[in-house]
C-alpha cells in the first residue's frame, strides 16, 4: 500500500496541495519531510502526537523525517487557533523546553525505523538573520493582502493581533525554505490549523527557487471525540507524554477508557497495527463490546510506544490490582501512580487506634460511624478488611513506610501519606 493510500485509509489526511504530484514523488524516491513543534511547554501532550505519528509512518516506510523544534518561533508565538496573544517566554524557559521536547522526540523516533531521523532547531539559522535581511530577502515576497486573508490572521482581526504574531507565518515559511535548500525537504506535515502557514512556505520556496520546485503540504484533520469535544483531554486536563505530569498508569487508563464509538478511529490514527488486525478488532467491538478488547489493545500499543514495555506492564498490574482489590501485590511506587487522583490525606507515623485515626484524618465523620463501618465490614486497610475496632495503625501497615490505602465500601479509596 502506498504511504499516501495508508494515510487516507487511516483517515489521517485533511488537505493536500497536490495529491497526484505527491503520490508520484513518494513512488519515485524516498523523500525528506518535516513537521515542527514550538516549545511552548516542557512536554508534548497526546494532541501533539497526531502529526508526528504520521511522520513515524513515513519513517517506517523508509522516508526521512526531519523534526523541527521551534527555538526561534517559540519565542514569538503561533497565532493559529488562538483568540488572544500568547504570553512571551524568556529565552531561558524556551531553551529548557527545547531540551525537554528534543528528548521526548528522540525517544519516539530513534527506534524501529528504516531510516534515521534528523532533529533541527530553527533558532540555529533564524538568529543569524538581521532585520534588514528579514525585510529585504523575505518580507518582500509576502503580500499584506494575502497574509490578511489567511484564516489564522483573519480570525484575529476583530480582537487584535500584534505585528509579532502577524509575522509568524513568514518565519515558518523561512523554515520550510531553509530545510528545502539545506536538507532537500519536500513535504511539510501539520495540523489542520497549519494550512495557511504551510502554503506560505510553498509560495516562498517557489518565488525564491523557481516555480518548478517540487514541494508539498499535507495537513491532518482535527480529531474530535464522538461527543463532539476535542480529542486529548481527560477529566484532569491534558494527557501529557511526560510521566511526571501524567503517569504511565493514567496514560494507560486514558486509552483503555476510550468510547466504543472512537476506539477504531484511534487504532487507525495512533497504532501501527495492520488493516486486517484493526478490522478484526472492529468486529469484536460490534459483537463483544463488553470485553473491551480493542480498548485494551489500544492502551497497550500506546503505552508501550510512549513509555516502553516495563511501564505498560506496571500500568496493567496496577489496573488488575485495583479491579480485584488485591493492592497488597503493589509496590509503593505503583501505589503512588495508581492512587494519584484519589482523595489524599496526611498522617504522622505515630501508632494510633484505627477508629481515632479515621476520624482525625476526616475519612470518617465520627467515632460512632467509624465503629459501625468496621463492624459491618465496610473498612479495608491495604486490601484487607478491618474487623476489630481495637486495631492499631502502625508504620508496619504501610507500603514502604510511605502510604496506607483505606477503602470504605466497595469503591471509595483514600490514599494516606505518612510523614514524620
Swiss-Prot record:
Keywords: Aminoacyl-tRNA synthetase, ATP-binding, Cytoplasm, Ligase, Nucleotide-binding, Protein biosynthesis, RNA-binding. It is an enzyme of class 6 (ligase). SMART domains: S4. ATP binds at residue 233. Its EC number is 6.1.1.1. Disulfide bonds: none annotated. InterPro entries: aa-tRNA-synth_I_CS, aa-tRNA-synth_Ic, Rossmann-like_a/b/a_fold, S4_RNA-bd, S4_RNA-bd_sf, SYY-like_C, Tyr-tRNA-ligase, Tyr-tRNA-ligase_bac-type. It comes from the Bacteria. GO terms for cellular component: cytosol. GO terms for biological process: tRNA aminoacylation; tyrosyl-tRNA aminoacylation. A motif ('HIGH' region) lies at residues 39-48. It is found in: Cytoplasm. The keyword Nucleotide-binding applies. It catalyses: tRNA(Tyr) + L-tyrosine + ATP = L-tyrosyl-tRNA(Tyr) + AMP + diphosphate + H(+). A motif ('KMSKS' region) lies at residues 230-234. One of its GO terms (molecular function) is ATP binding. L-tyrosine binds at residues 34, 168, 172. NCBIfam families: tyrS. Belongs to the class-I aminoacyl-tRNA synthetase family. TyrS type 1 subfamily. Homodimer. Catalyzes the attachment of tyrosine to tRNA(Tyr) in a two-step reaction: tyrosine is first activated by ATP to form Tyr-AMP and then transferred to the acceptor end of tRNA(Tyr). This is Tyrosine--tRNA ligase 2. It comes from Bacillus cereus (strain ATCC 14579 / DSM 31 / CCUG 7414 / JCM 2152 / NBRC 15305 / NCIMB 9373 / NCTC 2599 / NRRL B-3711). The lineage of its organism: Bacteria, Bacillati, Bacillota, Bacilli, Bacillales.
